[in-house]
C-alpha cells in the first residue's frame, strides 16, 4: 500500500492532548502505522549517560497513530484527506481531496 503520509509532510493532530497542533513528520514507522511529529506528543525519557552523551531527563517525540493525524492542504492550510492520481506522464502522485491540489512534485 502506498504511503499517504511521508517524512517532511506538514500534518495536524486530530485527537489527544496535542489536538490542533501542527508540525513536520520527522519519522514514519510503516510496520506499526505510526508517525513522529516534531514538537508534538513529547514524553520525558530517562537517559543513561554514555561516554559521548550526558545522562539525565530528556524530552523526545513519541509516535502517534497515523489515523490521529491529517495532512495539511497546501492550498487552504486546512486538514484534508489524501488520495492518489496518475498523471499523463505515468507518475502516481498524492492529491489533497479537499482542493485537488497535488502534494508531490
Curated annotation (Swiss-Prot):
It holds the Pfam family KOW. SUPFAM superfamilies: Translation proteins SH3-like domain. GO terms for molecular function: rRNA binding; structural constituent of ribosome. The keyword RNA-binding applies. Keywords: Ribonucleoprotein, Ribosomal protein, RNA-binding, rRNA-binding. It comes from the Bacteria. CDD domains: KOW_RPL26. One of its GO terms (biological process) is translation. InterPro entries: KOW (IPR005824), Rib_uL2_dom2 (IPR014722), Ribosomal_uL24 (IPR003256), Ribosomal_uL24_CS (IPR005825), Ribosomal_uL24_KOW (IPR041988), Translation_prot_SH3-like_sf (IPR008991). One of its GO terms (cellular component) is ribonucleoprotein complex. Coiled coil: none annotated. Belongs to the universal ribosomal protein uL24 family. PANTHER family: MITOCHONDRIAL RIBOSOMAL PROTEIN L24. One of two assembly initiator proteins, it binds directly to the 5'-end of the 23S rRNA, where it nucleates assembly of the 50S subunit. One of the proteins that surrounds the polypeptide exit tunnel on the outside of the subunit. Part of the 50S ribosomal subunit. This is Large ribosomal subunit protein uL24. It comes from Rhodospirillum centenum (strain ATCC 51521 / SW).
Amino acid at each position: 500500500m502506498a504511503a499517504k503520509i511521508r517524512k517532511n509532510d506538514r500534518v495536524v493532530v486530530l485527537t489527544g492532548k496535542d489536538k490542533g497542533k501542527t508540525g513536520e513528520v520527522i519519522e514514519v514507522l510503516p510496520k506499526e502505522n505510526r508517525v513522529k511529529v516534531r514538537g508534538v506528543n513529547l514524553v520525558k525519557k530517562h537517559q543513561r549517560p554514555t561516554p559521548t552523551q550526558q545522562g539525565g531527563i530528556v524530552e523526545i517525540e513519541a509516535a502517534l497513530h497515523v489515523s490521529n493525524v491529517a495532512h495539511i492542504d497546501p492550498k487552504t492550510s486546512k486538514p484534508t484527506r489524501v488520495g492518489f492520481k496518475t498523471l499523463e506522464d505515468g507518475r502516481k502522485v498524492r492529491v489533497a481531496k479537499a482542493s485537488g491540489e497535488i502534494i508531490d512534485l
